[in-house]
Amino acid sequence: MAEPHQEFDVTEDHAGTYGLGDRKDQGGYTMLQDQEGDTDAGLKESPLQTPAEDGSEEPGSETSDAKSTPTAEDVTAPLVDERAPGEQAAAQPHMEIPXGTTAEEAGIGDTPSLEDEAAGHVTQEPESGKVVREGFLGEPGPPGLSHQLVSGMPGAPLLPEGPREATRQPSGIGPEDTEGGRHAPELLKHQLLGDLHQEGPPLKGAGGKERPGSKEEVDEDRDVDESSPQDSPPSKVSPAQDGWPPQAAAREATSIPGFPAEGAIPLPVDFLSKVSTEIPASEPDRPSAGGAEGQDAPPEFTFHVEITPNVQKEQAHSEEHLRRAAFPGAPGEGPEAQGPSLGEDAKEADLPEPSEKQPAAAPRGKPISRVPQLKARMVSKSKDGTGSDDKKAKTSTRSSAKTLKNRPCLSPKHPTPGSSDPLIQPSSPAVCPEPPSSPKYVSSVTPRTGSSGAKEMKLKGADGKTKIATPRGAAPPGQKGQANATRIPAKTPPAPKTPPSSGEPPKSGDRSGYSSPGSPGTPGSRSRTPSLPTPPTREPKKVAVVRTPPKSPSSAKSRLQTAPVPMPDLKNVKSKIGSTENLKHQPGGGKVQIINKKLDLSNVQSKCGSKDNIKHVPGGGSVQIVYKPVDLSKVTSKCGSLGNIHHKPGGGQVEVKSEKLDFKDRVQSKIGSLDNITHVPGGGHKKIETHKLTFRENAKAKTDHGAEIVYKSPVVSGDTSPRHLSNVSSTGSIDMVDSPQLATLADEVSASLAKQGL
């Protein structure tokens, strides 16, 4: 669930600044959610801060717990810090909240508490980052603020964040990482751890612890918030109480590596080693924190380091920006990466590094109630870590447990007895995530009553454990307030879904549903609003969480549960076409019987007597064809053809002989034409020669009148041999004198030629 919010408004929410985006899938989260997210962040830290020596219950823890629970909803509707990072900084003016001041009283954790949870623990998780940032900005709410405020608080003994945190961190961070960190937080934690190792100095101080812690807690808190936003409340309470940015406090620790804060009892190095061993990634930062913060700081650092690796990258920027923007000491926080923070160092000197304080105050394994711290952290979470914690809690309950463990150390800023109780919840390593959820709610509401808040936190811690086992939704009720926290513990354990809805109605009020991320400024403002308003607001948040309930098992179940649909009563069903009669029909045809009855034809009579053949069996199987040759011996033919009776037609033996008849030899023509039998018609071999007669040309009149007749006849081929007439001269001239008949002959010839067409 953290992932949805992760991408919500990391840019807006200083995700880049806090590394929230890198941290627990909060890349998209808005650090602006700090206002509301601070509650989660603070809540997350609150569990860590639970081991506050103050013994004062950290209402923040319970509230944070409650807040953490809404993480599902927050994740669903991550509250973008309803203000831009700058707005948050402005909204979270640098203000040091008295150690006894409740997160709500400080007015830092109010809005974030339930609203952040309801609106979206995503916001709360981002608010974890915001917690640091708001701590820098002076928002007590930021988880980082919680730790650092606790650390920075002179009167606030360092929560045995080292011990508790070490103790928790092994179980809380381990589980949180395992549960919340397992999701994105653990990777982010390792990344953050790498960053923290790189930026170890910043993490070292309370600021380093907180900043890294806040960022890392924001990461881890997001895990915690995702798993159980309870962790954040302590952080929030712490910021509320101390009023100094968790990162500032962390930085104080960072800048003053060895000193445990005035009232803080430095945790032994063992805690750091313990935490380091348990939390490899977070441990490196924590050792740095431990160096800065002393032995007490390391446990706290462990938690913070766990959160800070990615956060530190973004936190370095975000913290610096927030601190510089909101707090004069913010720059010191910004340098958290650098390690010492001017403002935080001063604070560290001034305040007994609440985180260190608490670690010293509470044994490693002993949870310290820090209701005020939880409140501060709630505020921080609401403002800075709500989204982050919310997301974290959603992402992994273990993560939130870790955050709570570490944040209790941060929570020390509220050294009130209430502050110790929140830690007490987280004190159980396994339970840390759970107490954080319940502390969250306490943080927002209970910060005012530290002792009762712590107690409620404890109750919630017990419930929180159950809650942590259950969805975060259970934790959100704690955020409502001490009363809510107390109620919420019962509510939360039975039905995580109900706590978000009942405990988080304030959330929805503040966050006004998931829409509040849309207006980052508003949730933050509400978050920073007086602590008292926060519980009611958180209840609205819970309403927002009510939206989350779907995420929580109870809500999911209730939503998923649909009235059983009764099976249709088929007995009363009537079919228009009577099909119900065959309702039980089982097709298959297996029982079909084919009855073959033979017809009795004995009485049948045929019209045409065919009955006689009724028994006839066609087929001719028994038909016999008898071939009897006909005896023709006695047959006589009418015309004596009997003689040819054996004649075989076909003429097989007939031979056709063709003989040419020599009719020329045998035939004689009647008229003696035989003589001309060889006659070739047309004169066969004879040539017909035509000679052109030129007599006309040469003819002369009978009477020689002296005129010569000129006659031109067509040229006749010379092929033909001219027949020379006796009376025709070679020249063709006719000697009329010699042939008196020539004239007549010539005329005849001319006539014949003319006929022939010559």
UniProtKB/Swiss-Prot annotation:
The keyword Phosphoprotein applies. Residues 1-573, 715-734 are annotated as: Disordered. Interacts with MARK1, MARK2, MARK3 and MARK4. Interacts with SQSTM1 when polyubiquitinated. Interacts with PSMC2 through SQSTM1. Interacts with FKBP4. Binds to CSNK1D. Interacts with SGK1. Interacts with EPM2A; the interaction dephosphorylates MAPT at Ser-396. Interacts with PIN1. Interacts with LRRK2. Interacts with LRP1, leading to endocytosis; this interaction is reduced in the presence of LRPAP1/RAP. The modification Phosphotyrosine is found at Y18, Y29, Y514, Y711. Residues 217-228 have a biased composition (Acidic residues). It is a peripheral membrane protein. The modification N6,N6-dimethyllysine is found at K480, K628. The modification Phosphothreonine is found at T69, T71, T111, T470, T486, T492, T498, T522, T529, T534, T548, T720, T744. GO terms for cellular component: axon; cytoplasm; cytosol; dendrite; growth cone; microtubule; plasma membrane; tubulin complex. Residues 1-26, 179-189, 207-216, 314-323, 344-356, 381-393, 455-466 have a biased composition (Basic and acidic residues). This is Microtubule-associated protein tau. It is found in: Cytoplasm, Cytosol; Cell membrane; Cytoplasm, Cytoskeleton; Cell projection, Axon.
